[in-house]
């Protein structure tokens, strides 16, 4: 009798282990892991079976969605229960109660296999809905026109009043934006948002800034021309685009406190604007930075009309810096000129660490090929139509302030290059 009990327990244990091997993994919403800014009312869910699974075929699945993890565990107050669905497909489309904007949801899934075995529920995944059509903020910019070459800087100070549960930022820009909160870069993306036709649609980015919020806070935003204001002229005629304007943006921070209160920090006339280090930026050519220029004479912003009626969440992989390549060699061309070889052609930017006397001007010219030992951009420069020599092609220009080591790297431009002539 004891042997039978032991055998029965062993069989139960084996069954339990097999069941645990079959728990779905790699849960994604709209093809992303725990995404923010989901705009669609019908998000798509997908999952996989683990590599060590003994399941040959999934026969059924069940998905649960809730706005609290505890509700998933207790199977109550669900936003959606798919029920037991007969299907061998590892994806489904949400079909539950209306999803609220700026709300985090959690979901789990379990499956039944071809042997009739039921898995345990997966570890929960999450997604957060976007702001949709509920913007309270205003579009703002400075008072300059499309001919102003200096980049506009913006700031806003605010205080929090209690313990924060979570804080989410939504920001859209006609042009490119670089966003800092309390001196910290927000997000690891580069040159956001992705290009669209600005008269048809503009994309907004979503950031979880909960960990960056303090009692006293300052928001810093600088805008780049991007595709909204082409000041460099080329054969593609983007400088003639009918949507051309001074860069502008809209910003909304939603702060949820643990005591249940909600507060919004929005872009409006209370923000201030100034000029700073970036003296010129062009997505075609380069960026010019003067470290002697500081943000002074902060002025009031102006509110401007919305550039388009359609503002959508950016739900595609952004541009990111993915790898650093040190120079593999360099040669001295003259007393003040050096040529660096990075070993392969790439789309990217250079980062320059340098110290020198105040007012020293450093030019970093990028290119893909050499001719007689010097950088040769003739193959691509034929498309460029400069008015003067102040905006040389693929050449960043930096002016030193003389205060020790300085670091330069463009934030609103990238190059195609293997070589850099400094």
Language-model features, listed with the residues they occupy:
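C-terminal motif of bacterial Sec signal peptides marking the signal peptidase cleavage site
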Residues: 15-16
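Sec-dependent signal peptide recognition
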Residues: 2-8
């Amino acid at each position: 009798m004891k042997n039978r009990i032991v055998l029965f327990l062993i069989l139960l244990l084996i069954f339990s282990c097999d069941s645990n091997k079959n728990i779905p993994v790699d849960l994604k919403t709209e093809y992303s892991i725990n995404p923010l800014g989901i705009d669609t009312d019908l998000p798509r869910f997908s999952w996989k079976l683990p590599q060590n699974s003994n399941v040959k075929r999934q026969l059924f699945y069940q998905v649960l969605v809730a706005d609290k993890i505890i509700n998933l565990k207790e199977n109550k107050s669900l936003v959606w229960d798919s029920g037991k669905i007969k299907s061998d497909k590892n994806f489904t489309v949400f079909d539950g109660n209306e999803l609220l904007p700026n709300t985090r949801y959690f979901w789990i899934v379990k499956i039944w296999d071809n042997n009739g075995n039921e898995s345990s529920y997966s570890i929960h995944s999450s997604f957060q809905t976007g702001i949709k059509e509920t913007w309270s903020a205003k579009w703002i910019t400075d008072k300059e026109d499309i001919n102003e070459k200096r980049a506009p800087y913006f700031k806003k100070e605010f205080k929090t009043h209690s313990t924060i549960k979570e804080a989410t930022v939504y920001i859209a820009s006609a042009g490119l934006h670089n966003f800092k909160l309390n001196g910290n870069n927000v997000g690891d993306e580069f040159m956001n948002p992705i290009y669209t036709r600005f008269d048809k649609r503009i994309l907004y980015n979503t950031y979880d800034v909960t960990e960056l919020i303090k009692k006293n806070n300052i928001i810093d935003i600088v805008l780049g021309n991007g595709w909204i204001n082409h000041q460099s002229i080329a054969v593609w005629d983007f400088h003639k685009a009918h949507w051309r304007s001074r860069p502008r943006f809209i910003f909304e921070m939603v702060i949820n406190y643990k005591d249940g209160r909600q507060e919004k920090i929005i872009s409006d006339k209370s923000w201030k604007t100034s000029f700073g280090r970036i003296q010129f930026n062009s997505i075609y050519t380069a960026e010019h930075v003067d470290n002697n220029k500081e943000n002074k004479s902060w002025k009031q912003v102006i509110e401007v009309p919305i550039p388009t009626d359609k503002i959508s969440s950016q739900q595609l992989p952004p541009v990111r810096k993915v790898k650093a390549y040190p120079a593999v060699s360099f040669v001295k061309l003259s007393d003040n000129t050096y040529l660096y070889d990075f070993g392969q052609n790439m789309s990217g930017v250079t980062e320059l660490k340098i110290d020198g006397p105040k007012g020293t001007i450093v030019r970093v010219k990028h290119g893909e090929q050499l001719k007689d030992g010097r950088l040769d951009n003739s193959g691509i420069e034929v498309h460029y139509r400069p008015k003067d020599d102040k905006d040389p092609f693929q050449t960043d220009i930096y002016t030193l302030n003389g205060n020790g080591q300085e670091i330069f790297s463009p934030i609103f431009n990238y190059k195609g290059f293997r070589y850099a002539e400094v």
